[in-house]
């Protein structure tokens, strides 16, 4: 949807074919917490993805400002806390993040918080935690508001939308009369028949309304077995997740993982005890063998964009900008900066029309 909007804004004729509905209720994008945390995520990914996340922190405000509908966006940093018994794990993580920050020096340096500094940042957490880390500059957005705002924007820009219309690139003959110049395949796991290396990585997320919880920024709990994140949205809505399971199973969340998730959230803030569970959702993230995103051109006029793994919203603007470079110039300088796997056919023609598959 982001790509369709930006292409239409540039004056291209765009059709979008989506297997789902405007609400995108069965997509990983709807379930996600939409945290924009490149340094925090550097613990489990490569420097190129971290640079993509840093790039996105400057691009998201620009992209959101151009939308007619408001979208919650916050850039108040990330807080990381731990219990005393997990201090060794926290020290290991701290050293890792400091080393990663040296590899991507444009990122702001993390700040170590003692009890007094933690109390100033998040007063309610100081009652349970003696130390913490603050990662300045990181942020989050409301993914569901964004998905809805992009639907409105597509209507405003006369993007032709085809809901409940699953398609594959084979349906089209790019460049032929009456056909688009480009087909952009952004289907995630829906493209597995074309991109056999794709796999699903399952995640489980709970949404809780908790008026007694006053967290002001995304907060992560260090735990050797069960680390969690808590992303506070507007109106005391909290998105809480942790699990990452090597499986494309879309069945409901298990009792065990749900109990662990809720127990860990309560351990961070007692106000969750009286919260109300609004939703317990599972979804699978499209992931390539190296857990890194990639863009490839399989034939003239067909570009496949996939493998965003757990970093979809964090790197989406970077993937967008690389794709726009390819469509407009036939190559991308940004992809080199991001160490992004980009496999293009020898000759790419600039686009005037496009069909996006979602």
Language-model regions, residue ranges each:
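Short loop/edge segments at beta-strand edges and connector loops
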Residues: 18, 114-115, 161-166, 279-281
């Amino acid at each position: 949807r982001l790509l369709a909007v930006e292409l239409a804004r540039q004056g291209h004729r765009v059709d979008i074919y989506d297997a789902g509905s405007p609400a995108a209720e069965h997509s990983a994008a709807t379930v996600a917490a939409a945290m924009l945390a490149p340094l925090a995520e550097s613990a489990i990914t490569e420097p190129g993805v971290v640079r993509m996340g840093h790039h996105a922190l400057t691009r998201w405000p620009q992209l959101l400002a151009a939308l007619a509908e408001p979208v919650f966006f916050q850039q108040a940093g990330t807080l990381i806390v731990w219990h005393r018994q997990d201090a060794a794990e926290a020290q290991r993580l701290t050293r890792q993040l400091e080393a990663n920050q040296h590899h991507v020096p444009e990122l702001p340096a993390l700040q170590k918080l003692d009890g007094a500094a933690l109390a100033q940042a998040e007063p309610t957490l100081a009652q349970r935690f003696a130390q913490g880390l603050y990662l300045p500059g990181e942020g989050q957005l409301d993914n569901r508001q964004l998905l809805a705002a992009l639907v409105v924007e597509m209507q405003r820009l006369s993007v032709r939308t085809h809901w409940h219309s699953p398609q594959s690139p084979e349906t089209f003959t790019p460049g032929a009369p009456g056909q688009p110049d480009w087909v952009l395949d952004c289907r995630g796991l829906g493209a597995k028949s074309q991109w056999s290396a794709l796999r699903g990585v399952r995640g489980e997320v709970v949404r809780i309304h908790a008026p007694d919880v006053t967290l002001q920024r995304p907060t992560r709990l260090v735990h050797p077995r069960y680390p969690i994140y808590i992303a506070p949205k507007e109106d005391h809505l909290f998105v809480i997740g942790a699990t990452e399971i090597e499986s494309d199973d879309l069945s409901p969340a298990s009792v065990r993982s749900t109990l662990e998730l809720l127990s860990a959230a309560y351990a961070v803030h007692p106000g969750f005890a009286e919260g109300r569970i609004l939703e317990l959702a599972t979804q699978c993230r499209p992931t390539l063998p190296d857990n890194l995103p990639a863009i490839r051109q399989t034939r003239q006029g067909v570009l496949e964009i996939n493998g965003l793994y757990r970093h979809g919203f964090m790197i989406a603007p970077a993937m967008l900008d690389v794709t726009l470079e390819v469509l407009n110039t036939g190559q991308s300088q940004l992809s080199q900066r991001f160490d992004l796997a980009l496999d293009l056919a020898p000759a790419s023609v600039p686009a005037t029309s496009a069909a996006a598959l979602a």
